[in-house]
């Protein structure tokens, strides 16, 4: 049985604990050694393996590099003791702390063969043993990126034969069609793009004033033509949305006569009186209220004008 021991050090240097678990639980406490960097006290029988110098404490390395570095240093710094050589297949678990986390490893010795290293290093980011499966062990370079993008664009068979014409100063992005088969090309464009002229931009700013041609100004009417048209059509039934101020409708002579008669009786209108006038003149109560307000303002202006003239 192989167990792993994980301890969090209080110092900066990487720490590795190495122990032999082949002799039972009692041997675990005896064959256990902790050291910092590579400075450790000598012992008659200890299986010790320090971390390679290439692994800096502040760097994170993938599992493949850790396994290769551990395999290269196992033959130099680790010599199996007699207790390990006497067992049929003894395994030694070890691990070290780096700047990215803890990397546990296992080294097994067999009769008649040299010490082989069996790594089970896992990524510090994932605590499960399946973290290596989702770990990217190869650094992506520019050539790999170019080749992968070339394979991606190889799927778009209709990129070269796109029905759309390239427009200057715009990003040339292909329209991705269905992979099952090319669709029918569109022969008409959404907007007339023939009159487009790219603006000249220099390092110091805009290169003078740029004026649009007459054809370019006419293209803007395509977006605005639908709004006045809908308003003009909706004016007949009055059900659609109306923009702007409502058209003023003058009162008839019969309505004005009735309103003036009520105003001569009382300048301020009550609620019951407003309802009665609204029913007689075929006006809304709001219209009646507004007319009385305007009539009082008009009379006040006339009185002030007479006072100022006299």
Swiss-Prot record:
GO cellular component: nucleus
Keywords assigned: Developmental protein, DNA-binding, Homeobox, Nucleus, Transcription, Transcription regulation
Molecular function per GO: DNA-binding transcription factor activity, RNA polymerase II-specific; RNA polymerase II cis-regulatory region sequence-specific DNA binding
DNA bind region: 244-303
GO biological process, any: negative regulation of transcription by RNA polymerase II
Chief place where the protein resides: nucleus
Keyword Calcium belongs to the record: no
Gene3D superfamilies assigned to the protein according to its UniProt record, in alphabetical order: Homeodomain-like
Keyword Transcription belongs to the record: yes
UniProt subcellular location: Nucleus
Matching InterPro entries: AP_axis_regulatory_Homeobox (IPR051003), HD (IPR001356), Homeobox_CS (IPR017970), Homeodomain-like_sf (IPR009057), HoxA13_N (IPR022067)
Entries under PROSITE patterns matching the protein: HOMEOBOX_1, HOMEOBOX_2
Family: Belongs to the Abd-B homeobox family.
Chain's role: Sequence-specific transcription factor which is part of a developmental regulatory system that provides cells with specific positional identities on the anterior-posterior axis.
Protein name (Swiss-Prot/TrEMBL): Homeobox protein Hox-A13a
Organism this protein belongs to: Danio rerio
């Amino acid at each position: 049985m192989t167990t792993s021991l994980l301890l969090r050090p209080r110092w900066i240097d990487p720490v590795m604990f190495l122990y032999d678990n082949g002799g039972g639980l009692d041997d675990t406490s005896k064959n256990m050694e902790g050291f910092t960097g590579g400075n450790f006290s000598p012992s008659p029988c200890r299986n010790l393996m320090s971390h390679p110098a290439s692994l800096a404490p502040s760097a994170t390395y993938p599992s493949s590099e850790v396994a290769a570095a551990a395999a290269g240093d196992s033959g130099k710094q680790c010599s199996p003791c007699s207790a390990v050589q006497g067992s049929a297949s003894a395994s030694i678990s070890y691990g070290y702390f780096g700047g990215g986390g803890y990397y546990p490893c296992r080294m097994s010795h067999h009769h008649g063969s040299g010490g082989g290293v069996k790594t089970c290093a896992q990524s510090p980011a994932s605590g499960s043993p399946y973290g290596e499966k989702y770990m990217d062990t190869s650094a992506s370079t520019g050539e790999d990126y170019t080749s992968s993008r070339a394979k991606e664009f190889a799927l778009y068979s209709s990129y070269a034969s796109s029905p759309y014409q390239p427009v200057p100063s715009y990003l040339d992005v292909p329209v991705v069609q269905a992979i099952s088969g090319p669709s029918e090309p569109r022969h008409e464009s959404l907007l007339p793009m023939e009159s487009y002229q790219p603006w000249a931009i220099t390092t110091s700013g805009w290169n003078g004033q740029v004026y649009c041609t007459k054809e370019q100004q006419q293209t803007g009417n395509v977006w605005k033509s639908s709004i006045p048209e809908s308003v003009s059509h909706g004016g007949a039934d009055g059900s659609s949305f109306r923009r702007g101020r409502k058209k003023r409708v003058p009162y008839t002579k019969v309505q004005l006569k009735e309103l003036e008669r009520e105003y001569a009786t009382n300048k301020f209108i009550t609620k019951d009186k407003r309802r009665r006038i609204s029913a007689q003149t075929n006006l809304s109560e709001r219209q009646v209220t507004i007319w009385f307000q305007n009539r009082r303002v008009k009379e006040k202006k006339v009185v002030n004008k007479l006072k100022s003239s006299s």
